Amino acid sequence: STAWSIATPGCPFHCTFCCIQAPFKSGESLAGYKDSANSYRFWSPARVLDDLTLLVERYGVRNVKIADEMFVLNARHVNAICDGIVERGLPLNIWAYARVDTVKDSMVEKLARAGVRWLAFGIEAASERVRADVDKGFDDELVVRTLEKVRGAGIRVIGNYIFGLPEDDHETMQQTLDLAVELNCEFANFYCAMAYPGSPLYERAIAEGWPLPASWGGYSQHSVDSLPLPTRHLSAGEVLRFRDEAFQTYFKNPRYLAMVESVFGAATLAEVVAMTAHRLERRFAA
């Protein structure tokens, strides 16, 4: 069985496309916090371990998604939780979020021993200019190096990529797709940039008069009415079409399919092949 758990609600980073601070900062100004200070709280390792123990012993849970926006951040906190999982003998398969610039060498083996089988990384874009414009600052060399050490410890990787950030053009989006294909993560998510209400990008879109969806369905990544942001160089329809073609390119890549069959087996390979046989219906794709 599977369950979610939380260890560190909130996020200390300021990526402008993200709306996570909308719920976590709610009411904090009344408590005296500055608007510029993002909300991020640590639950004690003992509390987290007690929750995980309860899930295992009472409910028979073996698969846990740590639903934090950023679990792998503070080495002392993460290492204490990982050490406790090992000491308590909790037989878990764990999925969690990380950033390429937060995974310290001291964490990797501890994460693997504790049962962390998947880490999801927000790589977002290959262009440092595009990333810097949305306050996502790291270089491609760090991306490659971090993923190598994580996968070297036996932890599988989900790469998350965004097409259509404000500085994107066809060339930079192709660079992002090329990086995704090169990294060949065990799974990948391809998103269009959306100005989600509550995000700094939403406020920027309002201020600059960028077109926004007329209904909540337009904010859905996979809906017929999905309407991403245009960029300084591309229409929303062009971004949407590129994203959908990038999905097909990645998941039909022979190198990726060979890796899936080798790591996960023929049944999973068949599921991936079946997935790419279905194209999303889009109203606004150019």
Q: Can you name each region flagged by the protein language model?
A:
Residues 74-81, 171-173, 268-271:
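Short glycine/threonine-rich loop-to-helix capping motif typified by GTGT followed
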Residues 107-108, 167-182:
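Catalytic cores of alpha/beta
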